[in-house]
Amino acid sequence: FMYIIEKERGENSNCSVIVNLDKGEIEIYAEKEIVDDLEDPVLEILLEEANKAMPEEKFEVGDIFVEVIDPRIFGRRMINTAKQFFNQRLQDVEKHYIYEDYSQRIGEIVIGVVHQVQRDNIFINIEQAELRLPKKEQIHSERYRRGDSIRTIVKSVEVNPRGPEIIVSRSDNHFLYKMFEMEVPEIEDGIIEILAIARHPGERSKIIVKSQDRRIDPVGACVGMRGSRIQAIVRELSNEKIDIINNSEQSEILISRALSPAKPIDLYIDDDRKYCVALFNDDELEFAIGRGGVNI
């Protein structure tokens, strides 16, 4: 708006603009010095005219008179140009705010509404922000429709010419971690630690947990009374089976627990080279590997 005013009245017009976003109103004011002899009508006003316009003020020469300018004097084309420029600037500010906001929320769970479902992407709205859930970040068995509520984790935020691109995920391991953090207070408080996660999203997950307090069973705390905590997570993940494994300082015990329900005949562990060879009967091999190699 100042560009239009300066173009119409000059750069030194002593004008100010107030924009009321809630009401969609624009107010333009021009400060003029009150004089006896008018030389510059843009910057000055005669004492007689000032007192006539606002007799209650009783102006004197040298005072400042604030004139209210009707935006319509600039013409429809100029006003439309100003509106377009203002709207563009408003969008730029909004995009910057969204980028800054979600850049600080990477790794957090957010809840939005499905806006559009495409073959390779699901677009989610949260207030003014649009989030993209790519196919590879989805749980393959899930189907969503426009208007559905959906919980995801913010994975990354990038800038492109159209504005911030916010990528979210439901298949990421950290999504499972945050779900446990939400449902198990002992994890949020740091009493129980999740050491590792292996997932085949929507099918099966295995997590290794450790308690910092010997009095608290980490597996029992994660499962909850009558399975209340773990079932809340399983339902959110479309009945994904979740195995919770108690950590052990002994490699043989930990590996055997991780390979369950398969039972190895023998284990050959090289702690220095950090690898293990496990032997199984043929009928146990498929269970040992797990769907998608989740046990490996």
Task: Please annotate each region the language model reported.
Residues 1-295:
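RNA-contacting regions in translation and RNA-metabolism proteins
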